[in-house]
Amino acid sequence: MSHEPEYKDWQQIVELIRSSVDNQQHEMLLTMLMTPDERESLTARVNILNELLKGELSQRQISQMLGVGIATITRGSNELKSKSDTDKDKLKTLLEQGAQ
């Protein structure tokens, strides 16, 4: 008998998270899925994207402010460059709403 994982692709994970939000269990789910270091890294990534989208600081300044390496900022910048202006605007709006 062969066993296969139930969750095989990213969309299934997104749907799992969406379902956890609908059931108000997202904090529990994300806390159980991610180690403290992973949660810290995710927080840094959100801040990197937020600062890059604001465009007020250089990559070096963002690196110093967040205590992460320039390469980490560059990866975030490269990911943003691969997205459409529409997607960047949507992300910027989400980040602004989340910070309130």
Swiss-Prot record:
Job of this protein: This protein is an aporepressor. When complexed with L-tryptophan it binds the operator region of the trp operon and prevents the initiation of transcription.
Claim: Zinc is one of the keywords in the record: no
BP-aspect Gene Ontology terms: negative regulation of DNA-templated transcription
Gene3D superfamilies on file: TrpR-like
Organism lineage string: Bacteria, Pseudomonadati, Pseudomonadota, Gammaproteobacteria, Vibrionales
Name of protein: Trp operon repressor homolog
Cross-referenced PANTHER family: TRP OPERON REPRESSOR (PTHR38025:SF1)
UniProt feature, compositional bias: Basic and acidic residues: 78-93
Localisation per UniProt entry: Cytoplasm
One Pfam family in the UniProt entry: Trp_repressor
Repressor recorded as keyword: yes
Naturally occurring in which organism (per UniProt): Vibrio campbellii (strain ATCC BAA-1116)
InterPro entries tied to this protein: Trp_repress, Trp_repress_bac, Trp_repressor/repl_initiator, TrpR-like_sf
Gene Ontology molecular-function annotations: DNA-binding transcription factor activity; sequence-specific DNA binding
Family: Belongs to the TrpR family.
Positions of the DNA-binding region: 59-82
Self-association and partners: Homodimer.
This protein's UniProt keywords: Cytoplasm, DNA-binding, Repressor, Transcription, Transcription regulation
Record GO cellular component, one term: cytoplasm
Residue span of region Disordered: 78-100
Domain of life: Bacteria
SUPFAM superfamilies: TrpR-like
Chief place where the protein resides: cytoplasm
Name of the gene: trpR
